[in-house]
């Protein structure tokens, strides 16, 4: 047996493991066959008292682990015993004799022992994947973007906010790289100010996924959104092409956690799903190589949450879950990708889930993935659909509006609607499912939209005709609050975007506002206005149509509409707004829809020019120079150098302040004028003198050329190391450089030698010259007087 950690502290949990040196003849997999039983653990405390734990059953591998928390200082003694056991195998019996382990001592101190194992702190500079598995805690700033709307597969031209709760996100408009993926911007000539087709109406030329530092997006022709060229993969940090899947449309990525007796870790897949929702086919690819692995057929791909097609969700281990509401037969079904795979490829002995081994080229029957398919205990309207699904919260919401029989197929407003809440999980062996609650909503008008998620038990509904919000309890269905009209501008009717994050319902639309409402009482927390633009648009302001991204306490939102004219309006920006206060963090020119955020990087297509812009911190390079010749003590030294951006997008251009970053990037990348008043960054200068003393000698700010200088006078003679440091900013990583000087002691002053008398001839000539000069001066004065 073994105990860890040793030594331990009072109250600290230790792991007590025991292991028999033989295995059962009949043990199969993790749970099959006969396992050894009756293990006892005898514990002697420091005061001599005893306690016994057990009996325990071993795993198939003849060992097990239990936990124990010592309560007093001193030495504990542990000893394991096995009582012996008959194992009845096929055709014979085997007896395993009793045995007792050697005693193991555990020294317990007042405090836990520090074994010196630490993880690096969270990064402040930029970084790239892979992340070392030793860097515990980095999950707090790192995340992937597996679906087009983070954890929603579909990102239509509207209804597409997305919330990534873990990843860091850019705090400035600094561009890491840009890359054109299609023609964009003004063509010129006879076409005047007309721009190339943006694809914002339907095609959506850039709906990126991000997996392990790789961007994947589907390429469409500019002529038809249903047609597909293929899926392209690029490096998140450089824009470099990595692979291309010809003719394949990757719908989403998956990271699946496998955890069985022999396999532990994450596996990444790419999914291409096609066919009707009642009988879909998923083709699964390896995410690293893009090679085909296996195919799942006969999938019931539930409809709901997003109009147009089925909407999968992730389960707790990353499995793909698809809920289906069968209104024709009043049934509710859950399909689980992992169940289908486990059932198709069981461990030896027929135990699904004890190994993950889908064979290359295999075809899996998707019907094996039906986790449950149960009747609903009440009649369900045939038109009812699942409108809201939140697996983390454990609820789904079904909705249907009333229709009058005399106008079959049409709804007369105001109308009534029925809502039903169902659980996303039901108990194993359940033979039916009932709604958690059913509510009839009155006074329903056109354009009802739900929040994309549930938070703290609250979901919201938007009545566009009256421009008001309602908040409801998902546990009871009761209305908690409702607002007055949220806008006094008629364009507020066209509001599509609703997402709950950080305790607020966030919404944006055509009235030019991004607003936040407290989900506990519906009060307005803050609002952000995009500004007046007069006749530049038909709205007097800049609308939002396509939604927004939320990450790292910030909201990334752009100005756009469904089908912008070929002569695009001016003034659209990517706005980054503090999600808690509604204050602007930064903004940059561009019509930038449907971006994705991962690991502190934001990538998005700018419809103004057809280029992908990827924002985030980039590397910097600082240099420092000092005189190469010796310096005499008492003389001043000019220290100079430069600080340059090393990002691929603008390699070796000057670093500028965060406050001027947007204008600087617009100048470098968007044909805008140079911001002549832009400021540089602050450089710290330190020295190590001949005595080994380290001290600061001042700071300098770089200019628009990237250069800086500092005048300094050394205090003592000897060798100096000059260190120039840039601590980094929201835009750039830190960097430093060194230079060296030698300061010589000033020479000792000596008395001049006795002067040698000048020859008489020299004195004569000198005197004559002085006399002539005096005459010239006098003549000049006289001439001036005559004037």
Give the location of each predicted region.
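Secretory targeting signatures
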Residues: 18, 173, 290, 477, ...
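Repeat-blade elements of multi-bladed beta-propeller folds
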Residues: 18, 129-132, 136-156, 190-231, ...
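Enriched for extracellular/lumenal, surface-exposed ectodomains of secreted and cell-surface proteins
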Residues: 76-100, 719-734
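Structural beta-strand segments of beta-rich domains
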Residues: 12-16, 635-639
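Blade-level signature of beta-propeller repeat domains, shared across WD40, Kelch, NHL, RCC1
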Residues: 581-632, 638
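Short amphipathic, basic-aromatic surface patches that mediate peripheral association
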Residues: 19-32, 642-676
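Sequence/structural signature of beta-propeller modules
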Residues: 106-182, 351, 359, 624-626, ...
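Residue-level recognition of secondary-structure-to-loop junctions
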Residues: 65-72, 76, 702, 706-716, ...
């Amino acid at each position: 047996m073994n105990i860890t950690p040793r030594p331990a502290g009072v109250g600290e949990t230790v792991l007590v493991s025991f292991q028999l040196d033989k295995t059962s003849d009949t043990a199969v997999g993790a749970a099959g066959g006969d396992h050894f039983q009756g293990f006892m653990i005898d514990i002697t405390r420091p005061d001599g008292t005893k306690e016994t734990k057990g009996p325990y059953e071993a795993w198939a591998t003849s060992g097990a682990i239990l936990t124990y928390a010592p309560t007093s200082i001193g030495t504990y003694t542990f000893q394991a015993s096995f009582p012996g056991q008959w194992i009845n195998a096929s055709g014979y019996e085997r007896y395993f004799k009793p045995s007792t382990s050697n005693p193991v001592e555990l020294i317990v101190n007042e405090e836990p022992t520090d074994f010196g194992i630490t993880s690096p702190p969270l990064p402040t500079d930029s970084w790239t994947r892979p992340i070392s598995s030793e860097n515990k805690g980095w999950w707090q700033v790192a995340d992937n973007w597996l679906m087009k709307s983070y954890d929603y597969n579909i990102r239509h031209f509207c209804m597409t906010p997305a919330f990534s709760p873990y990843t860091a996100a850019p705090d400035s408009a600094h561009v890491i790289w840009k890359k054109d993926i299609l023609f964009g911007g003004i063509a010129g000539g006879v076409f005047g100010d007309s721009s190339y087709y943006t694809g914002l109406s339907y095609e959506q030329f850039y709906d990126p996924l991000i997996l392990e530092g790789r961007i994947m997006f589907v390429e469409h022709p500019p002529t038809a959104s249903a047609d597909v060229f293929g899926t392209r993969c690029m490096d998140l940090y450089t824009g470099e092409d990595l692979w291309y899947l010809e003719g394949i449309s990757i719908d989403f990525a998956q990271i699946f956690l496998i955890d069985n007796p022999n396999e532990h870790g994450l596996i990444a897949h790419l999914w291409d799903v096609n066919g009707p929702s009642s009988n879909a086919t998923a083709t699964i690819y390896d995410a690293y190589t893009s090679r085909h692995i296996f195919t799942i057929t006969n999938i019931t791909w539930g409809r709901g949450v997003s109009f147009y097609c089925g909407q999968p969700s992730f389960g707790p281990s990353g499995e793909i879950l698809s809920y289906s509401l069968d209104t024709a037969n009043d049934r509710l079904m859950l399909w689980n990708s992992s169940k289908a795979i486990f059932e198709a490829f069981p461990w030896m002995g027929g135990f699904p889930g004890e190994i993950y081994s889908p064979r290359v080229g295999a075809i899996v029957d998707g019907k094996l993935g039906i986790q449950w398919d149960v009747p609903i205990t009440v009649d369900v309207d045939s038109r009812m659909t699942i409108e809201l699904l939140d697996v983390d919260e454990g609820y789904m919401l079904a909705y249907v509006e009333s229709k009058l029989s005399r106008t079959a197929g049409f709804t007369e407003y105001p109308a009534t609607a029925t809502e039903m809440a169902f659980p996303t999980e039901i108990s194993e062996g359940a033979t039916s499912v009932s709604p958690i609650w059913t509510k009839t909503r009155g006074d329903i008008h056109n354009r009802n939209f739900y929040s994309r998620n549930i938070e703290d038990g609250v979901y919201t509904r938007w009545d566009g005709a009256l421009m008001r919000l309602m908040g409801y309890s998902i546990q009871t269905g009761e209305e908690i609050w409702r607002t007055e009209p949220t806008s006094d501008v008629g364009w507020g009717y066209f509001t599509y975007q609703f997402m709950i994050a950080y305790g607020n319902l966030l919404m944006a639309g055509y009235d030019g506002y991004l607003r936040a409402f407290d989900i506990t009482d519906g009060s307005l927390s803050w609002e952000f206005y995009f500004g007046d633009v007069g006749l530049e648009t038909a709205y007097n302001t800049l609308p939002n149509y396509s939604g927004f991204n939320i990450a790292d306490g910030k909201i990334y939102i752009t100005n756009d509409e469904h089908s912008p004219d070929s002569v695009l309006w001016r003034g659209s920006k990517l706005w980054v707004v503090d999600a808690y206060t509604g204050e602007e963090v930064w903004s940059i020119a561009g019509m930038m829809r449907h971006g994705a955020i991962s690991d502190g990087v934001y990538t998005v297509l700018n419809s103004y020019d057809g280029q992908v812009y990827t924002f985030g911190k980039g590397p910097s390079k600082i240099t420092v120079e000092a005189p190469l010749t010796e310096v005499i003590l008492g003389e001043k030294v000019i220290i100079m150098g430069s600080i340059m951006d090393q990002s691929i997008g603008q390699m070796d251009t000057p670093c500028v302040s965060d406050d001027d970053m947007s204008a600087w990037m617009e100048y470098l990348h968007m044909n805008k004028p140079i911001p002549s008043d832009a400021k540089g960054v602050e450089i710290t200068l330190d020295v190590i003198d001949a005595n080994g003393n380290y001290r600061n000698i001042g700071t300098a700010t770089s200019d628009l050329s990237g250069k800086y200088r500092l005048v300094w006078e050394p205090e003592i003679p000897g060798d100096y190391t000059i260190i120039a440091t840039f601590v980094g900013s929201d835009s750039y990583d830190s960097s430093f450089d060194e230079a060296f000087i030698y300061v010589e002691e000033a020479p000792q002053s000596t008395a001049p030698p006795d002067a040698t008398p000048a020859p008489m001839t020299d004195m004569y000539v000198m005197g004559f010259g002085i006399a002539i000069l005096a005459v010239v001066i006098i003549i000049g004065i006289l001439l001036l007087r005559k004037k």
